[in-house]
């Protein structure tokens, strides 16, 4: 690859709380074998700006994980944009590997795999499957598949680079025109919920359903340091919103785009998953722990079904899927 012919910029999403991890990120970016043309730090309004490490530019944006994901990067002139969280570590050739994969696979987006599900111990895989619906697969095509319940399956024996239907959100190289064509501004409903979740999966799966090619790179040398700048103060509310959002995510990305007959099948898939989770909640009560999960299961489903019928949610443009 001719390093002189590749131009890309970096967009960092932050609350300004990553500290040393943020400094490490900037230093890593400056040491890349292919140096970025520009580094723009998108800081949520209401937070103090981190101390500048180099020549990065700080731009304020609206607070909210979905709002930060929905940016159109008007401050960036290059077509290729490296989107990353503020607590990611890069090996010196990480970006070069991602750019090489982008060209070789004729992809529109390449995500670095920072959560190696396939490397978990057998016991962890079993527990993840039981409690979170995250199942291993032996797909030879996809790194991650989104199932009809909106849960994902991960390739248990991946190649270095694989096409995917979803990906982790902390680090991805994407074409700016592709990013801006997704209409992710329609997903800002996610930010109305405290302790929101699902914004990364919705972004990645929308990319796939809109006909773009998403790839996952398993050996790019990117590490998520996970500074955990968000803190859960209300565990009950966080659990409730996670369950409610899961239904809304399924409704937006799986149910709405489905055909008339497909809607029956995907509905059965989701309610089987919900029944499984409800059963786990009942079992969890036996030792006297987290009884709120039972009421949350029922109440979240009830409120989510009402929510999709509200004028505000029903008025959101539907996905224009191509596959």
Task: Go through each PLM region and give its residues.
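N-proximal low-complexity "stem/linker" segments adjacent to membrane-targeting elements
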Residues: 1-28
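Short, acidic, metal-binding catalytic loop of nucleotide-sugar glycosyltransferases
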Residues: 27-36
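Short aromatic/hydrophobic "clamp" motif used to bind/position activated sugar donors
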Residues: 81
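Conserved donor NDP-sugar-binding/catalytic core segment of glycosyltransferases
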Residues: 93-138
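Short, flexible, basic/aromatic active-site loop/helix in glycosyltransferases
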Residues: 131-164
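Acidic donor-binding loop at a coil-to-helix junction in glycosyltransferase catalytic cores
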Residues: 167-169, 191-203
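Active-site donor/metal-binding and catalytic loop motifs
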Residues: 185-197, 210-235
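Non-catalytic, C-terminal membrane-associated alpha-helical segments of glycosyltransferases
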Residues: 238-245, 258-323
